[in-house]
Amino acid sequence: LLPRVASGAAIVVTASLAGVTPYTVDPLYAMSKHAVVGLVRSLGPTLSKRGITIHAFCPGRIDTAIIPHEQRSKDVFFMRPEHIATEILGLMNETETGKSWAKVSEQKPRFIIRAPGDKTK
């Protein structure tokens, strides 16, 4: 797939906050999301040389069937899927590549979660 991606392309890979923080409820889920974040951070510099951006999007809780309604706390806020889709579209225009972007609420802007040693601004 990557050899066929043209210069100017933008790739957004969906991870999760579980990919950048401990998630003791489901360690295997966390492991898979950490792998996504690592892949994006590793591919960023290489793809940048080809004019391609890649981002990991790490949202918090989203209103999907992964957590059944009867298991949800009434005090926990879930973001709407359509809001997340809008955020992903916005990432297509970000030029800083190989970064992990977090979104914890619909009311707050997304932000970069820097890797250790990342000195970019």
Question: What is each of the regions a protein language model found here?
Answer:
Residues 4, 21, 42-52:
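Active-site-adjacent segment of SDR/Rossmann-fold oxidoreductases
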Residues 2, 40-41, 85-88:
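Short-chain dehydrogenase/reductase
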Residues 16:
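Residue(s) in the substrate-gating loop at a strand-loop-helix junction
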Residues 35-43, 47, 57:
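Hydrophobic alpha-helix immediately C-terminal to the catalytic Tyr-X-X-X-Lys motif of short-chain
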Residues 32:
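Active-site helix of classical SDR
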Residues 56, 64, 72-117:
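C-terminal helical subdomain
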Residues 12, 54-57, 67:
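Hydrophobic structural elements of the Rossmann-like NAD(P)H-binding subdomain
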Residues 22-26:
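Active-site "substrate specificity/gating" loop of NAD(P)-dependent dehydrogenases
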